[in-house]
Design a protein with these regions (language model features):
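Active-site groove signature of glycoside hydrolases
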Residues: 103-122, 141, 145-150
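Acidic-and-aromatic substrate-binding clefts and catalytic sites of carbohydrate-active enzymes
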Residues: 23, 45-57, 80-90, 117-125, ...
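Acidic/histidine-rich catalytic cores of soluble enzymes
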Residues: 6-7, 15, 36, 42-43, ...
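N-terminal pre-domain/capping segments
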Residues: 1-105, 169, 250-266
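A structural motif
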Residues: 39-40, 70, 108, 198, ...
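An active-site-proximal structural segment forming one wall of the substrate-binding cleft
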Residues: 88-110, 125-126, 130-138
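P-loop/Walker A phosphate-binding loop and immediately adjacent motor/lid segment at beta-alpha junctions
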Residues: 65, 215-239
Length: 266
């Protein structure tokens, strides 16, 4: 049986449901809700949603997600991290160590971060040095570190991949998004560069026209591009629009599922 992409959810997309006044969705309900109500098979969770939680809470989340067959996969650090300024090194390394510990407790295999804007090659080189130190600490937890596309010179996929290559090792990778790829060279061009180094990709969902077409970028083109480079890891749906996210996420799920199935050989 051929491996194929798996559809998961970026939990941040459900913030409106978690913050609503009437019957807010509790964090401990997420795995069952996402599996049974949305038909998705894993969770990428922003770090701010875990703020104030205890180690016992983390273990409970891991247990619930295992029983719901909807595991936590990636812990996403919410704020950008400045890795090029040496003044920040102690705090950044400590933060990444804490994230790796939390990720292990809830069952994640990866931590994803966004880099504060890098404007020069010297700063990009400084980022590489900091990442090597950070990975040495994170390796104790057997957690991978994924770099999300950002701003500055690392907004280009090739430049971000160069950082990954310079850091080296199998615990460093990328986590691109459809949205960023669309606005930085186009989904086909950027995803071709980044997907071979990705352990998870954010399937950004903007909205749909009355005819049912996705706005701004083609979900079919995204899947076709990923298939062309042999990507078989997770696609984590994330809604960027306003209002109730369930309908657009469900439409995107169905569209992506159809595209994935169509891409599979008979």
């Amino acid at each position: 049986m051929t491996s194929q992409m798996v559809l998961t959810l970026s939990v941040g997309a459900l913030r409106p449901l978690m913050k609503r006044a009437k019957k807010p969705l509790d964090i401990f309900e997420l795995p069952t809700f996402v599996n049974e109500e949305m038909g998705l098979r894993g969770l990428n969770i922003p770090s701010d949603l875990l703020a104030g939680r205890t180690p016992k809470d983390f273990e409970r989340l891991c247990d619930i997600s295992d029983k719901a067959h909807c595991p936590f996969l990636v812990l996403i650090e919410t704020p950008e991290l400045n890795l090029w300024n040496p003044v920040n090194h102690p705090a950044v390394i400590d933060r990444l160590r804490r994230l790796a510990s939390a990720a292990t407790r809830i069952g994640c295999s990866s931590v994803a971060i966004s880099l504060a804007e890098v404007t020069t090659q010297a700063r990009a080189d400084a980022v590489v040095k900091t990442l090597k130190i950070a990975l040495a600490e994170m390796d104790k937890f057997e957690i991978a570190l994924l770099l999300q596309s950002g701003t500055g010179i690392l907004s280009d996929g090739k430049s971000l991949v160069d950082v990954v290559k310079k850091v080296g090792g199998f615990r460093i990778g990328t986590m691109p998004s459809f949205q960023h790829a669309s606005t930085n060279g186009g989904v086909s061009q950027e995803l071709r560069k980044l997907a071979p180094y990705a352990q998870s990709i954010t399937a950004s969902v903007k909205g749909f026209s009355e005819e049912g077409d996705h706005a701004e970028w083609s979900l079919d083109e995204c899947v076709e591009t990923l298939r062309a480079v042999g990507y078989v890891n997770s696609l984590s749906l994330d809604y960027l629009g306003k209002g109730d996210p369930i309908k657009p996420l469900s439409m995107a799920r169905d569209m992506l599922s159809a595209a994935i199935e169509a891409a599979e050989p008979a």
